[in-house]
């Protein structure tokens, strides 16, 4: 697996997969399991808001787990580590406040284990030990396909906008989405969504220099598909009431763009 005979790499990537898949499945299909352990009903009696945020973050975890499966067949991909390692580090820091408030440090421990596992796997992968020693492709994103370049640039701009706009209006995603209710916990999850966008910015900047990664394109396609299907399901079941048009447009463009980029570059998969 992973185009390596190193059993340590296999074990470390397996650990990372298990933790990502476990959290993804729980967040998407049984969010109350985590809400009961971290949420404070006194300050946030509305668990629907947290469930929506958990669905979004759960999709990101499922995407990360799928990336490990993809690399199991195709080999380790440096672009995946450029995405997953910063994301895990961000989420460990992000988990400190909820852990202190609830006294439950399980999340920090598991994320730390996953981070260490990825670092060990990367260190034994044969990649340059210096993570900033990034090979430079002949062209942006390493491709002559202008449509692919434009879509990836738009993705970079969109994710960068999410990060910048968070610092301008930290509560915008909550205030502009009627179905979401304001609370301390909701604000913390809004921060988590910004950190997810920041990890994507790092990954896209890496790919812009080193060349596009079919691992990350596949990860993005899976996440965007889950977001898009979830959005359609919400529109059907609720009639669209309480939604955020900007989020809907973003999810749609994310999905359509991911599909186009994937199929225009599938020969590299």
Language-model regions: role of each:
Residues 9-28, 114-117, 143-168, 257:
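Alpha-helical transmembrane segments of multi-pass integral membrane proteins
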Residues 80-96, 196-203, 217-234, 252-257:
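Hydrophobic alpha-helical membrane segments
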Residues 9-13, 75-86, 148-152, 212-223:
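Membrane-interfacial loop-to-transmembrane alpha-helix junctions, especially the N-terminal start
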Residues 18-22, 48-72, 157-161, 184-209, ...:
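Core segments of alpha-helical transmembrane spans in multipass integral membrane proteins
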Residues 36-49, 175-185:
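Perimembrane loop-to-helix junctions flanking transmembrane segments
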Residues 1-2, 126-147:
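Membrane-interfacial, low-structure loops and terminal tails that flank and connect transmembrane helices
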Residues 114-134, 253-269:
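Membrane-water interface at the C-terminal end of transmembrane alpha helices
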Residues 92-107, 228-247:
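Membrane-helix boundary connector in multi-pass membrane proteins
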């Amino acid at each position: 697996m992973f185009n390596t005979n190193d059993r340590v790499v296999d074990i470390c990537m397996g650990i990372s997969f298990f933790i990502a898949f476990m959290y993804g499945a729980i967040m998407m299909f049984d969010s109350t399991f985590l809400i009961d352990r971290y949420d404070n009903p006194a300050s946030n009696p509305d668990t629907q808001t947290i469930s929506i945020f958990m669905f979004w973050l759960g999709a990101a975890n499922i995407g990360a787990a799928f990336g490990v499966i993809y690399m199991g067949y195709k080999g380790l991909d440096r672009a995946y580590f450029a995405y997953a390692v910063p994301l895990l580090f961000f989420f460990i820091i992000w988990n400190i406040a909820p852990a202190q408030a609830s006294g439950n440090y399980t999340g920090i421990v598991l994320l730390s284990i996953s981070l260490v596992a990825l670092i060990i796997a990367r260190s034994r992968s044969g990649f340059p030990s210096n993570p900033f020693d990034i090979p430079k492709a002949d062209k942006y994103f390493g491709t002559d396909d202008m449509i692919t370049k434009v879509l990836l640039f738009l993705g970079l701009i969109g994710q960068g906008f999410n990060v910048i706009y968070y610092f301008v209006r930290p509560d915008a995603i909550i205030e502009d989405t009627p179905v979401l209710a304001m609370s301390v916990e909701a604000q913390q999850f809004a921060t988590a969504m910004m950190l997810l966008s920041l990890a994507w910015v790092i990954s896209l900047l890496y790919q812009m220099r080193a060349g596009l990664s079919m691992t990350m394109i596949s990860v993005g396609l899976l996440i965007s598909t889950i977001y898009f299907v979830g959005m359609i399901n919400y529109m059907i079941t609720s009639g669209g009431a309480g939604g955020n048009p900007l989020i809907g447009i973003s999810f749609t463009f994310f999905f359509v763009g991911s599909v186009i980029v994937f199929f225009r570059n599938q020969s590299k998969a």
